[in-house]
């Protein structure tokens, strides 16, 4: 069955679900304690398969299905890592040659709600910087993760994944412990035309 890709029209800010609460501290005194939200960092390494953002999107998929959304499972396994970055202020006019693909060990996995890969970002480049409203301008949502790891020739393990930078107008690697928002995507099954 054919499907239509939907890319959320807003970035979920990296501080979503984060809060400071006035609590009793270990020493018995009271003070503010910061609690991280579910997507404050990509994860412990550049592997989307085991990332905090993928875990969160799995929960989102379950919630959406309970609300009646019928989303397709999409192959989100990695076949490539990338090196390089697009030029700042190039936005959707970036050159694909600035990003170099490197074959990677294949990961078998599917998701119903997911982040775009670098390959998909290239394919849907005209949509990467389009939004409804101006909410993305707040500091916690000025860039959003892609699911592709930054690699290196001959191996992985860089501790970086790619992100779309909305202010600088580029696609670039970011340390996985750094803060980026997320822009979920999903595919809805389309009925065959008659």
Model-derived regions: residue spans:
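Collagenous Gly-X-Y triple-helix signature in extracellular proteins
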Residues: 1-194
């Amino acid at each position: 069955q054919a499907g239509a890709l939907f890319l959320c029209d807003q970035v979920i800010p990296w501080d979503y679900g984060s809060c400071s609460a006035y609590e009793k501290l270990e020493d018995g005194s009271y003070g503010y304690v910061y609690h991280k939200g579910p997507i404050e960092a990509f994860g412990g390494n550049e592997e989307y398969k085991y990332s905090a953002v993928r875990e969160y999107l799995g929960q989102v998929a379950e919630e959406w299905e309970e609300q009646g959304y019928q989303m397709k499972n999409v192959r989100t396994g990695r076949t490539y890592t990338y090196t390089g970055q697009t030029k700042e202020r190039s936005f959707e006019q970036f050159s694909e040659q600035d990003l170099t693909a490197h074959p990677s060990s294949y990961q078998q996995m599917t998701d119903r709600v997911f982040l775009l890969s670098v390959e998909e970002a290239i394919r849907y480049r005209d949509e990467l910087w389009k939004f409804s409203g101006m909410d993305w301008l707040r500091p916690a949502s000025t860039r959003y993760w892609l699911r592709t790891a930054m690699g290196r020739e001959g191996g992985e393990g860089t501790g970086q994944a790619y992100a779309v930078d909305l202010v600088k107008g580029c696609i670039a690697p970011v340390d996985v412990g750094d803060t980026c928002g997320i822009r979920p995507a999903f595919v809805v099954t389309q009925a065959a035309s008659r």
